[in-house]
Amino acid sequence: MYDLSSKFNSFYTTHVVLPQSEQDNLHTKKNLNIQRLKDGLKEYNAENNTSYSIVETCVQGSVAMSTVVQNEDEDYDIDVAVVFDKSVLGDKGAQATRNLVANALKRKTKQFNTEPEVKTSCVRIKYADGYHIDFAVYRRHYDSTNECWIYEHAGSEWSERELRGLTDWFKLQNDDSDGDLRKIIRLSKMFCKSRTTWKNMPSGLLQTVLCNEKLQSTYERTDEQFYYTMQEIVNRLETSTSVAAPVDDGRDLTQRNIDHQRMTNWKNRLESKLEDLEVLFREDCTKDDAIQAWYGFFNHDYWGDQIIASESYSVNSVTKSVCRFFDGEQFIEELYPMQLLYHCDVSVSYTHLRAHET
């Protein structure tokens, strides 16, 4: 495979990894809206003579795993779990508890363009600049026998689920791969977001599980590891588009038809674009060929700029060569081989003058 690792690594560092300043911004928004929720609950309690409160919060998803990637549309997803005590909620159902969270948020987000949206698995608030925060709602009770907290997620109904299980699992897998897993997941997400026309692509969680399942850790170069991991994912999805969670007793992450359609879309689009990378394995592959191939795969301006820079370098090289050719005084013998032959006619006349004596 053509070694373009220097530029590939530069692409990853400068255009894939989310800058620390942006990561800090996400955490600031997270903290601000948790406080809004708490303040909204206090107001709700004062009006309704209740005592609901958030007893625990936990960042989940890509923010917790540090797999968020740069996004030109700034459509960043922040997942936050908010936990109530089961004893305080009483017999309040999953839907009713999500409605409670939405009510509390609505009181403190009146400046937003859209009201909090109650979804099946969370309550979402959207920022005008593209950010959105998903509040996953939980309740907990203490298991004195096993001396641990039991958490239940408010989905279509209450269901037992680990609060930090996925994040802990990911950190362990990433450490075992010396950080390579996080790199491959980020690159996979960049591919899935590479075309605005690509709808219904898999969630970050589904990509995370399959990237871990098929990670080709025998390759040292990131570009090779990414390529062969994606190839293995295509092969895997040819067999099955079902994915099970690595925690929560292997719950099905692809229960809906749309989930399977997203996995199929991923497979088809990956397969098509991987074919365009076959030029990287040709013996006559040039640097320009490799740049063009990765540009076609990621559809990112970074690679387009590399093509322009390469073409500009070629033109400048020719110009400099021409300039050097005419730089300074030029002699004909520097251009053509020469053999000089001389023919001379010499005529000598001699006159002897005798001096006169005096």
Which residues make up each language-model segment?
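Conserved catalytic core of two-metal-ion nucleotidyltransferases
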Residues: 98-144
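Conserved nucleotidyltransferase catalytic core and NTase-mimicking acidic/glycine-rich helix/loop elements
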Residues: 180-293
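A structural signal for beta-rich interaction modules in eukaryotic proteins
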Residues: 346-349
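N-terminal regions immediately upstream of nucleotidyltransferase
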Residues: 1-75, 87-96
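A generic structural motif
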Residues: 84-90, 216-218
